Amino acid sequence: MRTVLLTGFEPFENEPINPSWEAVRALDGERIGDAVVVARQLPCVFGAAIDGMAALLRELKPAIAIAVGQAGGRTEMSVERVAINVDDARIADNAGAQPIDTVIAAKGPAAYFSTLPIKAIVRDMRAAGVPAAVSQTAGTFVCNHVFYGLMHALATPAGEGVRGGFIHIPYLPEQAARHPGEASMSLESMVRGIRQAIATTLATEVDVREQGGQLH
């Protein structure tokens, strides 16, 4: 049986919970097709988060690795297209670090694309009743940091054949209640969307070709 690694983050920026961890841990141990889900939490800390991801890849040897993170203010599940090789933190991480214009991997490329079937995932999430879209930026905080670190690891011989990517999710309703005017999504919808992302990835070797870009 194949393994699907899901990661979520600990809370950050004074939030008592992080929806990414709440959503992925709800799927821990679940069987989807011929795969079993293993969910693990990463620290919201530059460096340590990539180290944690690398250790999980070595330990679990997953067929698929999907990192999930909170993006307060987004209105739908965002299936990320690209990770960029820069840290530029608007706020400090949970260890107090705030790197600015810092390269993630000195010998790494400027960017990596997700190897998930991102457009098929969005199509199937929407068909399952979950608002979703392809996103062209994962930001420059710890989410992008982990996304880049994941894809950098999968670009090595040890990562050959492993598919990886990143999904951002909105606030939970109880978080949005503390941020008037911000969008939210129920935990049930988040879990359903991530489950669908896994099922679609397992079933899709070549992504669909359909519109998923933005003008700005």
UniProtKB/Swiss-Prot annotation:
Compartmental location: Cytoplasm
GO MF entries: pyroglutamyl-peptidase activity
EC number: 3.4.19.3
Domain of life: Bacteria
Catalytic activity: Release of an N-terminal pyroglutamyl group from a polypeptide, the second amino acid generally not being Pro
SUPFAM superfamilies recorded: Pyrrolidone carboxyl peptidase (pyroglutamate aminopeptidase)
UniProt-listed PROSITE patterns: PYRASE_CYS
GO CC term (a single one): cytosol
Alphabetized InterPro entries for the sequence: Peptidase_C15 (IPR000816), Peptidase_C15-like (IPR016125), Peptidase_C15-like_sf (IPR036440), PGP-I_bact-type (IPR029762), PGPEP1_Cys_AS (IPR033694)
Catalytic residues as annotated in Swiss-Prot or TrEMBL: E80, C143, H168
Keywords (A to Z) from UniProt: Cytoplasm, Hydrolase, Protease, Thiol protease
Gene Ontology annotations of biological process type: proteolysis
Family matches, as PANTHER family: PROTEASE FAMILY C15 PYROGLUTAMYL-PEPTIDASE I-RELATED (PTHR23402), PYROGLUTAMYL-PEPTIDASE I (PTHR23402:SF1)
Assembly and binders: Homotetramer.
Functional summary from the UniProt entry: Removes 5-oxoproline from various penultimate amino acid residues except L-proline.
Family membership: Belongs to the peptidase C15 family.
Record protein name field: Pyrrolidone-carboxylate peptidase
Organism encoding this protein: Cupriavidus pinatubonensis (strain JMP 134 / LMG 1197)
Underlying gene: pcp
